[in-house]
């Protein structure tokens, strides 16, 4: 889980890279769930929320400019 304080310290490019990596991880987890290889389905929820958290902070930074 990524904390909001950690994300706020990153610049816009860093946030975009973080979002991209989280989306890749989320896709992999979804594929594991579809093939019934994922044991802990709660990781899907936390990954989805981490993506939303990062996107929110990115939007805040872009609006501040």
Curated annotation (Swiss-Prot):
Database matches in InterPro entries: Ribosomal_uL29, Ribosomal_uL29_CS, Ribosomal_uL29_sf
Keyword set includes Magnesium: no
GO molecular function: structural constituent of ribosome
The entry's keywords: Ribonucleoprotein, Ribosomal protein
GO CC term, one of those recorded: ribonucleoprotein complex
UniProt xrefs under Pfam families: Ribosomal_L29
One GO biological process term: translation
NCBIfam families in the cross-refs: L29
Family, as annotated: Belongs to the universal ribosomal protein uL29 family.
Name of the featured protein: Large ribosomal subunit protein uL29
